[in-house]
Amino acid sequence: MALNIENIIAEIKEASILELNDLVKAIEEEFGVTAAAPVAVAAAGAGEAAAAKDSFDIELTAAGDKKVGVIKVVREITGLGLKEAKELVDGAPNVIKEGVAAAEAEELKAKLEEAGASVTLK
């Protein structure tokens, strides 16, 4: 019985969430890869004034005491999975989102700070 892509996809469609999670972990271990989306780190600005900027990078500098709430907000902002969002929060300081318009950046900063995080706009 030869395995082909259609058979593999059919098996994946029938698998439960727990089985799929185990599959992802096994693939990560077997091939030494990660399913996390890459997060680019912003380069330091060259003396630009914040008022003159029209887009900002949102940097999580610390998660604070309410880490679970911060992880939820990070997931909402980035669309990352739970594991990836937790790794991002645990690895602070990290850039959460890049190239955000000024108004949206302030809104997201307020949302993160309300959840208990320390945030800077770059």
UniProtKB/Swiss-Prot annotation:
<dbReference type="InterPro" id="IPR000206">
    <property type="entry name" value="Ribosomal_bL12"/>
</dbReference>
<protein>
    <recommendedName>
        <fullName>Large ribosomal subunit protein bL12</fullName>
    </recommendedName>
</protein>
<comment type="function">
    <text>Forms part of the ribosomal stalk which helps the ribosome interact with GTP-bound translation factors. Is thus essential for accurate translation.</text>
</comment>
<dbReference type="GO" id="GO:0006412">
    <property type="term" value="P:translation"/>
</dbReference>
<dbReference type="GO" id="GO:0003729">
    <property type="term" value="F:mRNA binding"/>
</dbReference>
<dbReference type="Pfam" id="PF00542">
    <property type="entry name" value="Ribosomal_L12"/>
</dbReference>
<dbReference type="InterPro" id="IPR008932">
    <property type="entry name" value="Ribosomal_bL12_oligo"/>
</dbReference>
<dbReference type="Pfam" id="PF16320">
    <property type="entry name" value="Ribosomal_L12_N"/>
</dbReference>
<keyword id="KW-0687">Ribonucleoprotein</keyword>
<dbReference type="InterPro" id="IPR014719">
    <property type="entry name" value="Ribosomal_bL12_C/ClpS-like"/>
</dbReference>
<comment type="similarity">
    <text>Belongs to the bacterial ribosomal protein bL12 family.</text>
</comment>
<dbReference type="InterPro" id="IPR036235">
    <property type="entry name" value="Ribosomal_bL12_oligo_N_sf"/>
</dbReference>
<dbReference type="GO" id="GO:0003735">
    <property type="term" value="F:structural constituent of ribosome"/>
</dbReference>
<dbReference type="GO" id="GO:0022625">
    <property type="term" value="C:cytosolic large ribosomal subunit"/>
</dbReference>
<dbReference type="InterPro" id="IPR013823">
    <property type="entry name" value="Ribosomal_bL12_C"/>
</dbReference>
<keyword id="KW-0689">Ribosomal protein</keyword>
<comment type="subunit">
    <text>Homodimer. Part of the ribosomal stalk of the 50S ribosomal subunit. Forms a multimeric L10(L12)X complex, where L10 forms an elongated spine to which 2 to 4 L12 dimers bind in a sequential fashion. Binds GTP-bound translation factors.</text>
</comment>
